[in-house]
């Protein structure tokens, strides 16, 4: 499930949460 949040890495990647 893709949450509407982003990692603080570069390039920014979508973070996944179950």
Swiss-Prot record:
**Record-linked InterPro entries:** Frog_antimicrobial_Ranidae
Taken from the UniProt record, the cysteine pairs bridged by disulfide bonds within this chain are 5-15
Which Pfam families did the record assign? Antimicrobial23
- Assigned keywords, A-Z: Amidation, Cleavage on pair of basic residues, Disulfide bond, Inflammatory response, Mast cell degranulation, Secreted
- Keyword Cell inner membrane in annotation: no
Its subcellular locations are: Secreted
Tissue expression: Expressed by the skin glands.
One GO BP annotation is: mast cell degranulation
Q: Name one GO cellular component term.
A: extracellular region
- Its main subcellular localisation, reduced to a broad class, is secreted
Q: Residues where Arginine amide occurs?
A: 18
Q: Which family does it belong to?
A: Belongs to the frog skin active peptide (FSAP) family. Brevinin subfamily.
Biological function: Mast cell degranulating peptide. Inhibits granulopoiesis in human bone marrow in vitro. Causes histamine release from rat peritoneal mast cells in vitro. Does not induce apoptosis of human neutrophils in vitro.
Task: Specify the protein name.
Answer: Peptide tyrosine arginine
Organism (species): Lithobates sevosus
């Amino acid at each position: 499930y893709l949450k509407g949040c982003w990692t603080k890495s570069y390039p920014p990647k979508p973070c996944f949460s179950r």
